[in-house]
């Protein structure tokens, strides 16, 4: 058991409900199993593991609109109902829950679980929670994948000022990763897709330039061809062995994703990002994935939750 992790909560099977169409197991709720025992993960049977990071402490610290703590369970609820077009089976490992602003402790415990799963040959598909999940997720991967790059689909760079010893928030995860890489004398490989000019201050663009961040603006995705965009991604991933892929739902337009802390009036459409996401999965270099910033209390008719689940389902079905 993960008994020594105070903020770990086992999976809730009640979230995984759906329509029974046929005797065949054709929906996600019929392909899910539940594990909370470390020994069950020490097996040759490699799995895709769903793990939630139920936190909006980082959003609160970043002066955003809270509610994302409820995101992981809502994504699982919506994913459960969807048809599954592959023969894989999945594991819900539960959530790490941030209580009483214990963000650093929660991030550390989430990282421990991610590390343990990957060390035993499994892959993680994680659900946030605020984008503070990115620093937690990266910590769990970094020692296992030396030539690791980070690709973030996001309206924001999330490179707000951060110094070691300070408290991080949902706007600092990639600054924290950059600081970590500097300390470890490792290269900082970071690419951000969907950046909004008016979602980032000039100093953040300067910071991105200083750190040699590769990025495409939302405008680039509107104006440039898909072939041009894929060539850009190819250039970034060429010398990387592995990729940690993270999706912040505020990269999408408010009409598609109203249920986020910082909705974007000029955001992207789902079909502008899906081909790029699928291309990255098909590269074979993505070792871990998460989707962040769903805030159910801010959502409208479950639009954002259903879209988050659909994005995950599409990527799980991509080979």
From Swiss-Prot:
CDD domains: Formimidoylglutamase
Pfam families: Arginase (PF00491)
Record pathway: Amino-acid degradation; L-histidine degradation into L-glutamate; L-glutamate from N-formimidoyl-L-glutamate (hydrolase route): step 1/1
GO BP, sorted A to Z: L-histidine catabolic process to glutamate and formamide; L-histidine catabolic process to glutamate and formate; putrescine biosynthetic process from arginine, via agmatine
InterPro entries: HutG, Ureohydrolase, Ureohydrolase_dom_sf
PROSITE patterns, sorted: ARGINASE_2
UniProt cofactor(s): Mn(2+)
GO molecular function: agmatinase activity; formimidoylglutamase activity; manganese ion binding
Top enzyme category: hydrolase
Catalysed reactions, as listed in the record: N-formimidoyl-L-glutamate + H2O = formamide + L-glutamate
The EC number(s) this enzyme carries: 3.5.3.8
Transmembrane segments: none
Binding site for Mn(2+) 2: 154, 156, 248, 250
Cofactor: record remark: Binds 2 manganese ions per subunit.
Source organism superkingdom: Bacteria
Protein residues bound to Mn(2+) 1: 131, 154, 158, 248
Keyword terms, alphabetized: Histidine metabolism, Hydrolase, Manganese, Metal-binding
Biological role: Catalyzes the conversion of N-formimidoyl-L-glutamate to L-glutamate and formamide.
Family statement: Belongs to the arginase family.
Protein name: Formimidoylglutamase
Species assigned in the record: Legionella pneumophila (strain Paris)
Protein's gene: hutG
């Amino acid at each position: 058991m993960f008994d020594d992790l105070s903020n770990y909560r086992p999976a809730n099977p009640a979230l995984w409900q759906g329509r029974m169409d046929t005797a065949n197991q054709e929906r996600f709720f019929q392909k899910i199993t539940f594990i909370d025992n470390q020994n069950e993960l020490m097996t040759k049977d490699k799995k895709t593991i769903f793990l939630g990071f139920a936190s909006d402490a980082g959003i609160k610290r970043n002066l955003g609109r809270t509610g994302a703590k409820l995101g992981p369970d809502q994504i699982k609820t919506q994913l459960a109902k969807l048809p599954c077009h592959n023969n894989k089976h999945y594991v819900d490992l539960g959530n790490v829950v941030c209580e009483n602003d214990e963000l650093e402790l929660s991030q550390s415990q989430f990282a421990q679980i991610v590390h343990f799963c990957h060390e035993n040959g499994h892959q993680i598909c994680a659900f946030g929670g605020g984008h503070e999940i990115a620093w937690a997720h990266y910590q769990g991967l970094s020692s296992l994948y030396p030539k690791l790059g980070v690709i973030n689909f996001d309206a924001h760079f999330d490179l707000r000022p951060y110094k070691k010893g300070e408290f991080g928030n949902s706007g600092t995860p990639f600054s924290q990763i950059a600081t970590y890489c500097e300390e470890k004398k490792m290269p900082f490989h970071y690419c951000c897709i969907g950046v909004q000019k008016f979602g980032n201050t000039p100093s953040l663009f300067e910071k991105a330039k200083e750190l040699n961040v590769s990025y495409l603006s939302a405008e680039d995705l509107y104006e440039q061809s898909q072939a041009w965009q894929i060539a850009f991604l190819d250039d970034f991933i060429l010398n990387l062995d592995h990729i940690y892929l993270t999706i912040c739902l505020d990269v999408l337009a408010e009409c598609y994703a109203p249920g986020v802390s910082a909705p974007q009036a000029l955001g992207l459409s789902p079909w502008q990002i899906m081909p790029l996401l699928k291309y990255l999965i098909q590269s074979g270099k993505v070792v871990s994935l998460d989707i962040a910033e769903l805030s159910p209390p801010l959502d409208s008719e479950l639009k954002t939750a259903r879209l988050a689940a659909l994005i995950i389902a599409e990527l799980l079905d991509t080979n």
